[in-house]
């Protein structure tokens, strides 16, 4: 990683801090802990299940919203403020700008996830009074959630490289929703025929398979997660992220910024 990419990533992270994203998430973590504790206390004998399910789902959804709405503005804000022209007038290549923005946003989301994870574990400790061995699976679920954020970040940058912030948000959110039901879409494709089957199958394999990264229910029910699943999801997420980021770079390299 070049020094220029690191510098852009660091500035992107600082901008997120100045926008008080991290402070809002700390408050969110506290609210999440309180809500999970309240729901857990009124859920007899399933306190742990409720806290883990509610907590991890909130971490995922809130992080996706942050990834989309910060990601879609990373390029457009620089153009509107005309700071992009200053950056590119220096010995900074366009691909370095995109990659630096990605790492800056990804780093922001990793820190966000850390703070929200503290809220989840705090709520779990309150209702269960201790940690058990299966609770380590929560770390795997959080890892998959971070991989999910990486894909969303790359998609947000991809769409923002050629469209308006509004359309970028619509595209990214739509892909998130469709990708969350990718497995169901593949099952539906197997029940159809002709053009519908062809279209559904193509869509199921083109959209990011977020359903494979969602192990929240399995973790809440303390079901084991194999090393093969972790490896497959890691390779899949990194590959999809790299492809989307490459697309963003190619489009941005050819974009007329005048």
Question: Each PLM stretch: what is its role?
Answer:
Residues 1-23:
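Aromatic- and glycine-rich beta-strand/loop motifs that create alpha-glucan
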Residues 9, 74-106, 252:
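Helix-loop-helix units of permease transmembrane domains in multi-pass membrane transporters
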Residues 24, 28, 99-100, 171-174:
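Hydrophobic core positions of alpha-helical segments in small-molecule transporters
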Residues 254-258:
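Short cytosolic juxtamembrane segments of multi-pass membrane proteins
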Residues 30-74, 98-167, 183, 188, ...:
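Secretory targeting signals
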Residues 15, 76, 87-89, 156, ...:
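Helix-capping/transition residues at the boundaries of transmembrane alpha-helices
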Residues 2, 35, 43-45, 167, ...:
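Terminal transmembrane helical anchor/hairpin motif
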């Amino acid at each position: 990683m070049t020094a220029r990419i690191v510098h852009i990533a660091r500035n992107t992270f600082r901008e997120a801090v100045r926008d008080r994203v991290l402070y809002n998430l700390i408050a969110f973590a506290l609210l999440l802990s309180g809500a999970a504790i309240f729901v857990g206390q009124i859920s007899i004998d399933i306190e742990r299940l409720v806290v883990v399910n509610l907590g991890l789902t909130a971490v995922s959804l809130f992080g996706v919203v942050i990834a989309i709405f910060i990601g879609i503005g990373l390029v457009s804000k620089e153009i509107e403020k005309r700071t992009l022209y200053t950056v590119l007038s220096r010995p900074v290549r366009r691909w370095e700008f995109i990659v630096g923005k990605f790492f800056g946003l990804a780093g922001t989301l990793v820190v966000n996830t850390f703070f929200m994870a503290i809220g989840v574990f705090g709520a779990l400790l309150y209702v269960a009074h201790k940690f058990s061995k299966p609770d380590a699976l929560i770390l795997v679920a959080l890892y998959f959630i971070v991989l999910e954020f990486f894909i969303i970040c790359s998609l947000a940058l991809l769409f923002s490289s050629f469209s308006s912030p509004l359309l970028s948000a619509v595209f990214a959110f739509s892909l998130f929703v469709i990708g969350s039901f990718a497995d169901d879409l593949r099952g539906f494709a197997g029940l159809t025929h002709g053009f519908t089957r062809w279209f559904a199958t193509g869509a199921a394999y083109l959209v990011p398979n977020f359903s494979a990264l969602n192990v929240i229910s399995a973790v809440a029910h303390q079901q084991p997660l194999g090393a093969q699943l972790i490896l497959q999801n890691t390779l899949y997420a990194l590959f999809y992220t790299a492809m989307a980021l490459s697309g963003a770079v190619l489009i941005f390299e050819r974009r007329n910024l005048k």
